[in-house]
């Protein structure tokens, strides 16, 4: 039987401002190793600041070695991801809901945007398994104080775009940075052809 499909899995609405559920793509001139060619999913954005996690920085640490109870529901490759440079000794978890499921009334889930939810790692993964497609667990996060991110966007460090639910659980063998750019209209999609090492071009 074919799996149900959700239109939002294929079409991301245009993003003009930062809000939960948007992506920050590192611009081609942002060469700082921590954030170079990163794709950051925004989890919180309010008057107190902004919090997000890097979606394309897998580590070599297996989830089973850190949070074994969550290994079964973790999306491949079932490793911890580096969410950012802040509080690397703490963990944050995102998941995508199965099509047709809702987070309302489900203990351990907090809605972020669309089918993306934040997961309480103290919850029982077996109880959440029927509701979610999978989880991604991040060590640390990326954070900005009030106004800090606005300044970085103004100097073109970041491109603000909308996310698809599939971006959260995408396998690291896929170039997420390039994939997100290629689904944008011209001329922005041409940025996906920017070489990783411009000195070799």
From Swiss-Prot:
InterPro entries: AlgH-like. GO terms for cellular component: cytosol. Transmembrane segments: none annotated. Pfam families: DUF179. It comes from the Bacteria. Belongs to the UPF0301 (AlgH) family. HAMAP family: UPF0301 (MF_00758). This is UPF0301 protein MSMEG_6921/MSMEI_6732. It comes from Mycolicibacterium smegmatis (strain ATCC 700084 / mc(2)155) (Mycobacterium smegmatis). The lineage of its organism: Bacteria, Bacillati, Actinomycetota, Actinomycetes, Mycobacteriales.
């Amino acid at each position: 039987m074919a799996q149900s499909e959700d239109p939002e899995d294929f079409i991301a609405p245009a993003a003009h401002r930062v809000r939960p559920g948007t992506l920050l793509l590192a611009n081609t001139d942002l060469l700082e190793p921590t954030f170079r060619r990163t794709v950051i999913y925004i989890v919180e954005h309010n008057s107190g600041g902004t919090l997000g996690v890097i979606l394309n920085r897998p580590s070599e640490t297996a989830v089973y070695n850190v949070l074994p109870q969550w290994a079964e529901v973790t999306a491949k490759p079932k490793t911890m991801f580096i969410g950012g440079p802040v509080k690397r000794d703490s963990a944050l978890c995102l998941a995508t809901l199965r099509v047709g499921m809702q987070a309302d009334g489900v203990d351990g889930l907090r809605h972020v945007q669309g089918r993306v939810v934040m997961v309480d790692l103290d919850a029982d993964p077996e109880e959440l398994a029927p509701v979610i497609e999978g989880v991604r667990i991040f060590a640390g996060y990326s954070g900005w104080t009030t106004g800090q991110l606005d300044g970085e966007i103004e100097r073109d460090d970041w491109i603000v775009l909308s996310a698809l639910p599939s971006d959260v659980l995408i396998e690291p063998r896929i170039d997420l940075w390039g994939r997100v750019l290629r689904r944008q209209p011209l001329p922005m999609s041409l940025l996906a052809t920017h070489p990783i090492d411009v000195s070799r071009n």
